[in-house]
Each structure stands twice: as structure tokens, then as C-alpha cells.
Amino acid sequence: MEKPKQKLTQVTVNFFLKTSQMILQARSLDEHGKGKLNKWFNLHTFNSDDLRSELRLWRSTIDLTAVPPMIVETYLDLGNLPQGHTLALKDEHGNLWPVTKGGSKKTEVVLERWLVEFDPNEFGTIEELPYIYKQAIILCRSIYTIIRIMPAASLRNQSPHYVLANKIVDGSKPISSKGRIGLSKTIIPHQMLTDTHVRHRTFSPIETSLGTLKVSVAYRSHCEFTELAEWDHRELGREKEPREDLRQVESKGEEDHSIESIPYEEKAYKTDEEKSDKTPEHVQYKPFKPEFKQLEAVKLEGSDFKSELHEGTSPLSLSGSPSSPPRDDKKRPSIQPFRVGSIGNSPPPASSSLERRISITSNKSTSNASLAAVLRNPRSSFSIPIAGSIGTGAPVTGGFPRSVSSSHGYGYEDSDSAANTPRFSSSFGSRASRRFSNTSVRHGSLHDTTSPLGTSAGSATSIPLSGLYIDDDISDFVRMIDSKQDLRFGHDSGGSGSQSGSQYEVLNRFHQLKSQHQQLGDSVNASVMMHRKSSSPPGSYESHVPSIHSRLRESSEPHPAPATAPAPGPLIKPASKMMSSPVISTTSAHAMSQTASATTRDEIVGLATTPSTYRKHLHYENVFDDDDEDEDHHGYFKAKARSKSLSRSHFDDDDDLLFTMSDTNLAKH
């Protein structure tokens, strides 16, 4: 029983010696030195005579329970560093941090600390010696490989002024850090580290019946040391006025100029016993590169936006970039501030055969051109004054509602927003909710109440429950507008004076249309009560479509309304499928109602938008079914004829006067 223990003790002691020899030969000793060849654990090393005295404590071990831990330290010996030279450490970002200078009291920098120990308190059940020996072979080969890829391996024979050295000490005694920078002392500040400055590695232990053999190592993660000559006189001066140097670099505008400065503080190199918390500051100048600006083709007037390129720098580095040169004050090409469906930028369509209609409460024969002027107005600048306006000598600024909403009422924008730009909101929601859209409240507002165009859009803020209804497909309507050559503005690339003059002439020409349509403008401004027929003639057909409710003068009515008490009149119920324009909801049968004779007329007192004027709830039909135009016409009139006998039981709805705007109507004006 004693013999197996002696053999196990012999294997353990030789493992201690083999580990120390592998570390020293990889760091400080000559790997091909002279001495007796050691073939333990199938790994050839040399028994150096210099290590005989240092390893005497472990060579003379008889009892494994009393074997002390072995610590093998690898340190950087700075005893030969010249006076005035400084040793600096480079981090992963390329920044240099001062370690010590030649002639100081700190002459050693600990890089690695290996620990080999035998713990008798932890033991296993394996007693087979060959198995333990094979495990020791694997462990020695692992150490032999790891030790050559650690950070300190690159410092071997790097400089004659600082060399690698090793020290074997008893791990059971405290280790003094006097005159050296210990392993726990960080050189790079913690806030600059992406990882800890010390890393630990533990190898797989070997369990025996007497105890456990353990090997571990702690080492610095940064070991890229650099020697700086005459640093105190050449480099330290740059720390005093870093901002002045930075301004000089910016003024010169050099493409590649890098200054790295490492301040030095003597107080940062106290011993571990003094527990100094101070760390040297670091000032670095990154290479200067001229700032690259991308060419902006379009820029809004008054915009303060300035794009800048930022280079990633270290947290404590002082990096400067030159101020960007002032921009040229050249005229930028103007853009149209439409968010969806810009009228000014829409390409003309191949053909204009499709008929476009709009439903706005106004006189049919006098409102087409004014409405077209309203829709053309956003294509010009909103700040161009129009001289020679009708009825006043002062220039009038053209205005347009901030939001032209669809049947859902979305797209409302606050009037206090930064840009006074109109936008056409699209409604892609449920079709069922559109049926009740003509009772929705529209919040669009006109900032200029003296609009020279004189359309019913000017009453959007004065009449409750009023608004401009535009269907989803705004792009089709835009293409129809652009197809008319007389409606398109010229986008000349000439000077600013000719472009503004051209826009001024076009706006002034369409502004003169107010004299031809003064009746519609007066009706909007006067906001008189609207009268309508209480019953439809047998040959007339009306549809339930959204419209803008405005009050017209009594004189504008083709038939004066008798002063009778309000009474419900028969209503012809339209078919379930009705014609819907891709751009604006309208009806094609309203033109027939102007010439048909009326048999019974009743008067509805009050605004057409007031729900109290109707005795029963309104009945709305779905007008947004997108079917073929020809099929809608035939199905519409056939359904009207079939439902004629049943429509007498329904009351009037809140539809106002409708008019039809087609391509032919626009061409006349």
C-alpha cells in the first residue's frame, strides 16, 4: 500500500517540475538549452542548473499533504530601460497608455501568474496509476500549447531594454508588490476597457485517491508594450494645450494627421499597498479627415437641416472636425410640398377619355371653372400675391385648405403645424363607414378667408358639418388635370424671375374668372338659406352622395320656393349599385332634374345640414361600389325604374344641389 503512494507522490512532484520548466523555457530560458533531458509525460525539456535551487522545495517533497503550492510569475523587467524613456501600453483601439519611465522605482510589470497546487481535501476514487499518468500527459500538452498563444508570448526578445523574466515563489506565503506593478493593478482605465484587464483560465483537474492536482493561470489581456524615447520633452508638451493643437489641425485641413499624446503622472504608479484610485488621463487626436457632404438636389427654403458625418472615436479622445464651409446661396429648385399625389409632378396620361366629376354645393352652370381654379391653386407658390384682384386694390394671397379629407374625415392636420401645405388624404378603410360620411365633421380650415377664387371651399370654417369630399383615387384626377395643356404650369429651368413671372401670369389669368362666376362667390360669402325641391319629378333621379353644404341666395334659385309649412315629400330610392367616380363621388343623372317639371313642391326650413329638419332618419346608400362605368349606367337607371313605385314612402335626404364637372366643362373655361 505504501508503494503505490510513493509512486503517486513521484508523479505529482515531477508534474510540478515539468510545469515550471515548460513555462520558463517558453518565456525566459532557451528552449534548446543545455542540461539533462527530462522525458517525463512524453515531453522533452531540459533540467536547467539555474532552476535547481528554486525548485529545491518541491524536489524534496515526501508527503503530498505538505507540498506547498507553486507560483510561477512572468514579468517584464524594466531594469535596462534608459533614463527619459517611457514604457507605454497599447489598448485594442490603438491608444497608448503610460506604464512607467526609465529610472523610476517601478522596474517590474507582472504579466502572468501560474498556480500549480495539490489539494488533499479533494480526492477521488481512482487508484490506478497508469490512468493518472495518462491524464497528466494530456494536461502537460494542454499547458504547452496554451502558453505559446497567450498575450505575453509576443514579448519574447522584443527589445533589449525590457525583457521577459520568471520567478518561482512559494504560494503559501504572501507576495510583495514593492517595486513593481502587480497583476491587480490596471494600466488602462476601467472605463476604456471593453473587457477586464486580467483574465483567468483553469485547466481540468486530475483526481487521485490522495488528492486533486490543479493548474490555473491569471494573465493580462493587453501586453502590447511600446518604448517611447524622450517622451517627457517631446510628447508631454502636447498635453498642456490640446485644444490649441486641435484648432491648428482643423485650420490646416490636412487629410492624414495623427497626434497621439500620453500624459504622465507620477502619482499613478503607487504600490498596491497604497491602493491608489487615480488613473492617468488620456488625450488623443484622431486622424483628421475632411468632412464629406452629399450634394442635395432639392432643399426647402428656410431649412436649417445640415447633414454631418461622425467618425467613431474612443470615449476619452478629443477629436475635432472642421466646420463645414457655408453653403452657396444659389436658387434651389422649388418642390411641391404634397405628401401624396403631387399635382405638379404627375405625368400627363396617355388619354383623357375617362370622365371625372366632382360634387360641390354650388350653381351648376357657374362653378366649374372656379372649382378647377381651386384645384390648380396648390400647384403654385402659396405666398405669391395676386395683384389686380376683383373688388379690391390690395394684393390678395392665395389660400387653400390645409387638409382635403376623404369620406372618412382622416387626414386632419393642426393649423399650427410648421408647413402650410395641403395634402390629399386617402381613405382605405371600411366601405361601410363611408355611407355615413356626409354627416361627419370636417376640420379643414382656410387660413386666408379672402380667397380670390371664390369657391365653396371658403366656407369650410363658417358652416358646420361642411367639408370637401374627395374619393380615394386622387392620382386619376390629377392626371386628368395635367392632361389639359391650358391648366399646366410651365416648369422652366431658367432664372427665378421668369419662373415667378410665369406663375404670376397664370394665377392672375385664373383669378380673372371670378368676374364670370361672381354669383357663386357671393353665394358662399352671403351664406343664405338654401331652398330646394321637396319632391322629384317623375323623370328625375337623385343619388345619395356626399356633398359640401353651403347656403345660396334665394335669387340664385331657378324656381322660387313658396312660403309653405315644411312637409315630407316622396323620394325615389336609388338602386343599391350606384356610379362612383374614381376621384370624386358624383351622379350622372342630376342634369335631368334641372329641366324636369315638378308637380309638388314643399319647403324645408333651416340648413340642409341640420338633422332636425328631417322627420325620419336619413337613408344612405353605398355609393363606393367600383363597377364598370357602362354597366353602372344601365343598372342604375333600370333599378331606378323598378324602385319608382316603392320610393314614395321615403323622405328627403340632405343632398344639396349637385353639378357635374367633366372634361368638356373644363375645356370651355
Swiss-Prot record:
Q: Which UniProt keywords apply?
A: Autophagy, Cytoplasm, Protein transport, Transport
What cellular component terms from Gene Ontology apply here?
Answer: Atg1/ULK1 kinase complex; cytosol; phagophore assembly site
Q: Where are stretches of biased composition, namely Polar residues?
A: 438-458
**What ranges does the record list as Low complexity composition bias?**
423-437
For the keyword Cell cycle, the answer is no
What the protein does? Activates the ATG1 kinase in a nutritional condition dependent manner through the TOR pathway, leading to autophagy. Also involved in cytoplasm to vacuole transport (Cvt) and more specifically in Cvt vesicle formation. Seems to play a role in the switching machinery regulating the conversion between the Cvt pathway and autophagy. Finally, ATG13 is also required for glycogen storage during stationary phase.
Q: What is this protein called?
A: Autophagy-related protein 13
List the source organism.
Answer: Meyerozyma guilliermondii (strain ATCC 6260 / CBS 566 / DSM 6381 / JCM 1539 / NBRC 10279 / NRRL Y-324) (Yeast)
